[in-house]
């Protein structure tokens, strides 16, 4: 009988946690809205905003709502559009990471970014373009 109560309690906690997570509420006091017209993904309290155009890609980083110094940061993107795959290296440019060229960035394109900052472990960020 105790096992049934334990399982029921565990299921109840799991359902409560998923409902809380689905609401989009965050304890850290900032939202994840795009500031530059891109797609935002949060990984370990850092917001990564990918702004992708056919000739320019930018990646903006914010930590708890404040811009991150990207002077020692690089990123390697993999763009996946249907059967097409394209690798893109982003370098610091002003307060963001950037690459110029010709890119396939249609809605639905999946992007995997590996972001590396000196002295820190790399972060893997996944986007789906809108």
Region roles according to the model:
Residues 2-5, 16-130:
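Intrinsically disordered, low-complexity terminal tails/loops enriched in metal-binding residues
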Residues 9-15:
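Hydrophobic helical h-region of N-terminal Sec-dependent signal peptides
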């Amino acid at each position: 009988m105790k096992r049934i109560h334990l399982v029921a309690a565990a299921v109840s906690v799991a359902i409560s946690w998923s409902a809380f997570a689905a609401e989009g509420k965050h304890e850290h006091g900032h939202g994840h809205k795009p500031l530059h017209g891109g797609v935002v993904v949060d990984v370990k309290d850092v917001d990564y905003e990918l702004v992708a155009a056919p000739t320019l890609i930018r990646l903006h980083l914010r930590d708890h709502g404040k811009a991150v110094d990207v002077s020692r940061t690089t990123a390697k993107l993999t763009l996946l559009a249907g059967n097409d795959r394209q690798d893109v290296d982003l370098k610091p440019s002003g307060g963001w990471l950037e690459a110029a060229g010709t890119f396939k960035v249609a809605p639905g394109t999946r992007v995997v970014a590996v972001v590396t900052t000196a002295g820190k472990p790399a972060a893997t960020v996944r986007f789906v373009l809108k």
